């Protein structure tokens, strides 16, 4: 609904209206308490990057979400250019899909997201670690094939493993 309203709000022929950077890139900031739209239990964010030629797989992911009754208030689909040289860099040439997934009222949500994660790996994509809260650690090396390079940097910067996080423990990044 939000996506449709946002699309229809744009004037068809208006060319002389300037928006601030914040208005353009953060439209939800204009919606009072937008984060409460999913209720007390809230939502989780799931974001993947897929290679440019994986449009059929992108459609498959969207269809699985729709078939499961996953009605997301906000979805973002963007085309990525080339990624950068960081060993855990998320962007890659292709597509990124981000969705807000309600955490209640969807039976089988964990299994659905696990299957989506597996499909992402099958086509050479990855999940966005900054938004991930549930990915299986076994998938990480396939999504981030330069993980060993990152571990070398980690070992040099923190040989005593003093720096860690819940995510690092869950994904077995701490080593």
What do the predicted segments below correspond to?
Residues 1-175:
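Noncatalytic alpha-helical scaffold of FAD-dependent oxidoreductases
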């Amino acid at each position: 609904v939000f996506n449709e309203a946002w699309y229809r709000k744009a004037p068809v022929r208006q060319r002389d209206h300037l928006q601030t950077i914040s208005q353009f890139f953060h439209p939800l900031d204009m919606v009072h308490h937008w984060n409460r739209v999913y209720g007390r239990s809230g939502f989780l964010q799931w974001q993947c990057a897929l290679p440019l030629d994986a449009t059929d797989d992108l459609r498959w992911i969207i269809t699985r979400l729709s078939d499961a009754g996953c009605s997301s208030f906000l979805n973002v689909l963007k085309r990525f250019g080339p990624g950068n040289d960081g060993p855990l860099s998320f962007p890659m040439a292709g597509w990124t899909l981000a969705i807000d997934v309600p955490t209640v009222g969807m039976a089988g949500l964990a299994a659905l997201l696990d299957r989506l994660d597996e499909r992402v790996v099958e086509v050479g994509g990855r999940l966005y670690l900054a938004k991930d809260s549930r990915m299986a650690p076994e998938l990480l090396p396939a999504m981030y094939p330069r993980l060993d390079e990152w571990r070398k940097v980690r070992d040099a910067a923190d040989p005593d493993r003093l720096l860690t996080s819940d995510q690092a423990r869950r994904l077995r990044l701490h080593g």
